[in-house]
Amino acid sequence: DKFETTQLVAKPVSSSLASIFGKADGKSAMVEQPGWIFSGVLQEIKVGDPLITEETSSSAKSSIVMPMARRVKVINFNFTVSGVTNEIKTVSAALGGVASKIDLTTGAIVAGNQAASPVTLTFNPAGGTLQGTVLIFGNEAELSDEVRNNLQFAFETESGRRIPLEEDITEQLKNSGGAEGDLQIKIEGSLDVRYDAGLMTVVIEWLRGSEEDLEGL
């Protein structure tokens, strides 16, 4: 990570992960989003103001109270998985259109710095679940209608094949509270792994009413 005056910038992902998705949505560079970032700022300090300073001893020494705010959002993905799940070895994903830079004094994302970030996934074929989490500074799609949040999956099969699946989830993020600045965003859906005429396919359906998409190898 690096600081540029009051701005914090996300760092590039490892080359091995970046090679899986490339630019993810064709425009965004892949970056590793931050951990739990908190920041705060005081425009001025008034000695004696009980909201800012407080006495710590009888000798009237004062300490500065700095209000802090969380500067990252959490997107939680929860999928039920059905079908021939034993054929899927690993699942990777990346979310495009997220912000890669933030102003630490205000918490506002710095516009024009869209990126894609990897999603941490846990796949449980026996339990029929796929869960993922990604931390983001914010969503560039909130600032521009031209920016889309494309979620890219890469399913690796036991036979070594790779099944790509890309979904535009811009509206799902907005409908889940992402556009209103919620710090916790929940996205749910279902995945069905099928064999159709000898072709393995993955069908995804979103809980919030999006149409099905179908991709396969």
What are these regions (language model features)?
Residues D1-R70:
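Short, low-hydrophobicity acidic/polar segments
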Residues P67-T80:
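A short, Gly/Thr-enriched small/hydrophobic beta-strand-prone motif that recurs across taxa
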Residues S19-S28, L173-S190:
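Low-complexity, Pro/Ser/Thr- and charge-rich linker/hinge segments at domain boundaries
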Residues A179-L217:
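Hydrophobic, glycine-enriched assembly/anchoring segments
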Residues D1-T5, E87-S176:
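Tryptophan-paired
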Residues S58-A60, A69-R71, T85-E87, L143-V147:
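Solvent-exposed loop and beta-edge segments used for protein-protein assembly and interaction
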Residues T56-K61, A126-G127, K174-D182:
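Solvent-exposed, conformationally flexible loop/turn segments
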Residues K61-S63, V74-N76, T129-Q131:
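Intrinsic-disorder/low-complexity, polar/charged segments enriched in Ser/Thr/Lys/Arg/Asp/Glu/Gln
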